[in-house]
């Protein structure tokens, strides 16, 4: 019963603090009984610490016995009744934790089975073209690839490689784009620790941008982030542009060009007057992408005039930091057709696993709080789109990225071995993982002399160099300031494990006698004004200080500036102290590098990046963050053994250059240089004639064949006599004819020589001169509804059409043949539209100027623009096998569920007929299966669930609009996109952005479970408060007219 009595003592403590509380909303004393729900977020409950100790430390049997004991001693007193209820509650919480752990164990087992199956299938497909001897050699190749990774990285870091690198890059003039969206980002006086979004990542990206801007061969670096102009936020975060001054005085005087250097570019998106936490930024990502695309296009043109000989200088790479910026970088990479790089910093699957292991929240509750499934899907997309994924440690690769469907270390090694041998990978792709530790600028650091000859209590013999103010702010806490200082610097976050550190210090009397403890845990004015999580940690620490009577031995100053941090390190080194990072998991640990640079030995968690850091620097000890004794013993060993302390200090100072920013940037740029160069494929156009007023709307397409769009398609012979709808059934002969024509289109588009372009004689499509373009992107169950809306919109703006200021685009999942039949059935002509986005965004057509010869013109450059990581034949074979496996689940006499539709398929869209959508796997399951096999694609259920289109991973209807902006200069804000209340599974991509969106009530797909099987809820990505979104009361002419009037299109056009 000893354990049982211990539990009861904790429950008694809960009752002791369970009286009155403070209402955070009113600031007044509350007499309401405190809630015992652990997942409650509204108020801090001081009992949470005790409850969690009980749940994690004791068996369910002990908890049950406590409840039985409380129930058996029932009395009329309120205290005993509450004790019984508390026992019951805690017992149930413990059981819930076990239940969640069991469910997650089943999920992990299923994930393992799926990965093994996918790996076997991928290996079998790739083994078909190897001989028996080659198959045996593949194993050796895999081992070589695995064992040689570190060797290759060392070679890149060698003196010889660095000299070669400098000679190679000094003549280059690269443009690099970095993206970091959340938090408050500025170049000077960073407010690190102000909130959970403004942490180490902010400092990392700013310093990376600054360091890259100082490197030979880099002309300009843009760090793109969010412009914040909100009350309570400094005005500097609302400045559109901020130049980052170089830390290198030699390079700062060297003027490379007018626009050279590193800059923070703030893009306005989301609510204009509100600071938005990262979990709530997802609906506004498309708006950022559109704004960033405009900036990059303009900057590429400016750089072209300075260093590109008049041709645009496109980014060498677009580098996203964290999941939200990675999602943006993927879309930008696809729109620009340039390489993408990604750094995760903190990964969603790893965080989800950690939260579920704690047992306090279910998967649904975690998702509701952190929008974790949207974050995970963004990280999976980053694996699909990235050329390189940069990590800080090998643990991040082997234990964290390995959790994702899109990355398999074993399969990655196989693919790398095949590429080295020149053997086909059958359409499979895996991003390259590059371990490049973050850097630090050490030129300005002078390590402290670690002696006590001078007085650090604020009384110096000479007043020539007064002590920093922060020293006195810390020293005032100590009764004996000459003892070595144990320093911890972190946000007040539970995962930083600061409470365990205080407990370890408080319970080890020898350590308390030898050292002081300093906690730099953010800034605060009033604990009640802090966030719930931060105040919870701080109050727990204060309680522990009081419990162990640590007054005079622990410092916890309320305020510090970023500029004070070096002085804090110096003070700890001067006292011959130790720096500690006791976090449960530390992805890297930049503060460990900083501390080592100032001559401090370190003690750090054995989980994550510190293992690599201490392995390189050899300047400290690793500890188990869950073991208080391990923490106390390591600190005591370094503080008490002066010989060991001196050795660790010297090793750190000797090896610290391996973590410098120049070293990091050299490795970084070497990886960028290894990427296959990509840029927009269309030919440069004559900018001088771009604004020519002599080109009329009628002749603007006359010579379009001269700009490599001369692939024409005539469908006159395919029209059905008297047919009124493309839904009419076609006999097999007509279907075969259409398939042959469309296949011929695709083959011809690949074989055309796009270099033969007479730039001096170019004309431009009429779409360039439109002031407002209506994009009909409705996904209707009945084609008559789509035709009716098209005719209604055309009739509303019909009077303004002759001015040439208004245009139309049809964006659909239909094939070109189906579009042609649709237009014919409604009495419409291709010339009524400026462009046709077909097959869910995998094809782009324009109307031909010579309708008698051919009604449509294919933009074959769009094919090459979206071709990135398209699996081709290897993907098609896998999809056919998948369809066969799905059909095995049908009834004995039932028709096949999914059938390959070759008549509707093209080179960049593999189509499947779906006979029963309710039996077909969700699109997310198909994406998961493809990712497990390293096949990158975008799967879309469309046409009321009767068709499945599989297209390139970075192709979509929304990306096609961005392509039109990039190629023809059509402003994205000029688009007005008409959608229904629901649509295909790519529906969400059409909603956000700088374009106007009109949602037509009563129009949409009737397949209600289209979006029920999504990876994340629609409300997590729906920009409900966007000023660019309008919803009509219906779909008649008056409803649509009212919406267009609110948008301002009709009013603006009438004023022309």
Swiss-Prot record:
Tell me which Gene Ontology terms the entry assigns under biological process: sucrose biosynthetic process
Give one Pfam family, short name only.
Answer: Glycos_transf_1
> Could you confirm whether the keyword Hydrolase appears in this record?
no
Task: Quickly give the catalysed reaction.
Answer: beta-D-fructose 6-phosphate + UDP-alpha-D-glucose = sucrose 6(F)-phosphate + UDP + H(+)
Q: How is its activity regulated?
A: Activity is regulated by phosphorylation and moderated by concentration of metabolites and light.
Q: Name one GO molecular function term.
A: sucrose-phosphate synthase activity
Q: Which UniProt keywords apply?
A: Glycosyltransferase, Phosphoprotein, Transferase
Output the PTM entry.
Phosphorylated at Ser-158 and Ser-424.
What EC number(s) does the entry state?
A: 2.4.1.14
Q: From which domain of life does this come?
A: Eukaryota
Family annotation (InterPro entries): Glyco_trans_1 (IPR001296), SPP-like_dom (IPR006380), SPS (IPR044161), SPS_C (IPR035659), SPS_pln (IPR012819), Sucrose_synth_GT-B1 (IPR000368)
EC main class here is transferase
Q: In which pathway does it act?
A: Glycan biosynthesis; sucrose biosynthesis; sucrose from D-fructose 6-phosphate and UDP-alpha-D-glucose: step 1/2
| Region of interest: Disordered | 112-132, 681-700
The Basic and acidic residues compositionally biased stretches are 112-123
Does Glycosyltransferase count among this protein's keywords? yes
Function text: Plays a role in photosynthetic sucrose synthesis by catalyzing the rate-limiting step of sucrose biosynthesis from UDP-glucose and fructose- 6-phosphate. Involved in the regulation of carbon partitioning in the leaves of plants. May regulate the synthesis of sucrose and therefore play a major role as a limiting factor in the export of photoassimilates out of the leaf. Plays a role for sucrose availability that is essential for plant growth and fiber elongation.
Q: What do we know about how this protein assembles, alone or with others?
A: Homodimer or homotetramer.
Q: Which family does it belong to?
A: Belongs to the glycosyltransferase 1 family.
Record-given protein name:
Sucrose-phosphate synthase
